[in-house]
From Swiss-Prot:
Its EC number is 6.1.1.6. Gene3D superfamilies: Bira Bifunctional Protein, Domain 2, Nucleic acid-binding proteins. It comes from the Bacteria. Keywords: Aminoacyl-tRNA synthetase, ATP-binding, Cytoplasm, Ligase, Magnesium, Metal-binding, Nucleotide-binding, Protein biosynthesis. It catalyses: tRNA(Lys) + L-lysine + ATP = L-lysyl-tRNA(Lys) + AMP + diphosphate. Its cofactor is Mg(2+). Its main location: cytoplasm. The gene is lysS. This is Lysine--tRNA ligase. Belongs to the class-II aminoacyl-tRNA synthetase family. One of its GO terms (biological process) is lysyl-tRNA aminoacylation. It is found in: Cytoplasm. It holds the Pfam family tRNA-synt_2. It comes from Bacillus cytotoxicus (strain DSM 22905 / CIP 110041 / 391-98 / NVH 391-98).
């Protein structure tokens, strides 16, 4: 409605309210009752689209359809309209002599956006368009506001996000994105269920914000008079379940991080986390590439997808590259050799890598990767071997204790998954938490808190375990070729609208 001024809008609102009043005066309910449909627009097309005009006339197929009026034309005693349901549009043809005076008057006075029910016969027009010739016309819901201009739609991107219902009415592409999102999550569940994983539910409110490096949302429980944190990860509760003997578990759920909003970040987002006893990060790599390839095949019918200007091949096996080797390959800097923090800082200065004064060598290695390498990783790439300093919950590598058995998956220069061989040594875990507490004291409010209950759980014994986290929203972005996370969230977080 960006091309409709307020005066025009107010006039249309008044006209529609007047029509509402007239309907009630005639004893017609403008917000009607249940309507039984026999077919959707998609079913009509699939069943009868290949029939000839003559075949349809001979068969005289009766149907009952419903939807929103999107176009309307005609004068006198007959008219055409297109009505839209979930799957698409179908044309209806309404004649006064077929539906009667009262129902034809309803059709004549109906507005774009009204929801209607049609009973009639399937036919094809002279130009071959599959249509329904009405024998009955029922008003189901009177629309009191005009839809956006059909030729321009919602041009204001922010309005699309704030009023998603209008976006879904006017954009079949947007509607298809969210249908695809649902299919992606369904196939993910199917894959894990078929591979012996158990879906579980764990708390969204935690007494300690743990499982990730992020700033939490804080709330207050009045009855218990205590502060709680909206979860920033699902991880630590799932690993408690591994301790308890549930050997393969996963959860798909909302996670909350009190951080910035961008094309890749929303404060409230959906994650899947899974954990498998007696596995390691290499097993989880295989699971990750096989699961994502499976989802692409089942939902899209292919493992070759387009994202922006890039053609992405999701067919396993994907590239595996140690973080240090990736930095050496793309920057020519070798972090394999032992070095002091002063030497690492000098390298950062030489290569224009921004760092903080409190950073150790491991942090600087990660900054090199994020600032110089990440943007170059277009095809699916597992980056593994993250420094211990940035991986407080991952197991140290047996061959080089500076690094961990951890990986992140990058596609089109974005992180899509994070996984590791879980740290199951309670003594080492406590020392890592203590190191994180020192970082908090130095001003890093995203550093991990001490979680004594989790350490106690580890003391009972957690088997060697591989774990994985995937951002569902980013995966949906990838598989639907969507440039912004807001395009794949039905109701993204928005600033207050300015009056």
């Amino acid at each position: 409605m960006d091309n409709m001024n307020h005066e025009e809008l107010n006039d249309q609102l008044l006209v529609r309210r007047e029509k509402l009043h007239n309907l009630r005066e005639q004893g017609i309910d403008p917000f009607g009752k249940r309507f039984e449909r026999t077919h959707s627009s998609k079913e009509l097309l699939n069943l009868y689209g290949e029939f000839s005009k003559e075949e349809l006339e001979e068969k005289a197929i009766s149907v009952s359809i419903a939807g929103r009026i999107m176009t309307k034309r005609g004068k006198g005693k007959a008219g055409f309209a297109h009505i839209q349901d979930l799957h698409g549009q179908v044309q209806i043809y309404v004649r006064k002599d077929a539906v009667g005076d009262e129902e034809y008057e309803l059709f004549k006075t109906a507005d774009l956006g009204d929801l209607v029910g049609i009973e009639g016969k399937v036919f094809k027009t002279n130009v071959g368009e599959l249509s329904v010739k009405a024998t009955s016309f029922t008003l189901l819901t009177k629309s009191l506001r005009p839809l956006p201009d059909k030729y321009h739609g919602l041009k204001d991107i922010e309005q699309r996000y704030r009023q998603r219902y209008l976006d879904l009415i006017t954009s079949m592409e947007s509607r298809e994105t969210f249908v695809t999102r649902s299919k992606i999550i369904r196939e993910m569940r199917r894959y894990l269920d078929d591979n012996g994983y158990l879906e579980v539910e764990t708390p969204m409110m935690h007494t300690i914000a743990g499982g990730a490096s992020a700033r939490p949302f804080i709330t207050h429980h009045n009855a218990l008079d205590m502060e709680l944190y909206m979860r920033i990860a699902i991880e630590l509760h799932l690993k408690r379940l591994i301790v308890g003997g549930l050997e393969k578990v996963y959860e798909i759920g909302r996670v909350f991080r009190n951080e910035g909003v961008s094309t890749r970040h929303n404060p409230e987002f959906t994650m899947i986390e899974l954990y498998e006893a007696y596995a390691d990060y290499k097993d989880i790599m295989k699971l990750t590439e096989n699961m994502i390839a499976h989802i692409a095949k089942r939902v899209l019918g292919t493992t070759t997808i387009q994202y922006g200007e890039h053609e992405i091949n999701l067919e396993p096996e994907w590239t595996r590259l140690h973080m240090v080797d990736a930095i050496k390959q793309y920057c020519g800097v070798d972090f394999w050799k032992p070095m002091s923090v002063e030497e690492a800082r000098a390298l950062a200065k030489e290569h224009d890598v921004e760092i903080k004064d409190t950073m150790e060598v491991g942090h600087i290695i990660n900054e090199f990767f994020e600032q110089k390498v990440e943007e170059k990783l277009i095809q699916p790439t597992f980056i593994y071997g993250h420094p211990v300093e940035i991986s407080p919950l991952a197991k140290k590598n047996d061959e080089d204790s500076r690094f961990t058995d951890r990986f992140e998956l990058f596609i089109v220069a974005r992180e899509h998954a994070n996984a590791f061989t879980e740290l199951n040594d309670p003594i080492d875990q406590k020392e890592r938490f203590e190191a994180q507490l020192k970082e908090r004291e130095q001003g890093n409010d995203e550093a991990h808190m001490m979680d004594d209950d989790y350490i106690e759980a580890l003391e009972y014994g957690m088997p060697p375990t591989g774990g994985l986290g995937i951002g569902i929203d980013r995966l949906v972005m990838l598989l639907t070729n969507s440039p912004s996370i807001r395009d794949v969230l039905l109701f993204p977080t928005m600033r207050h609208k300015q009056d």
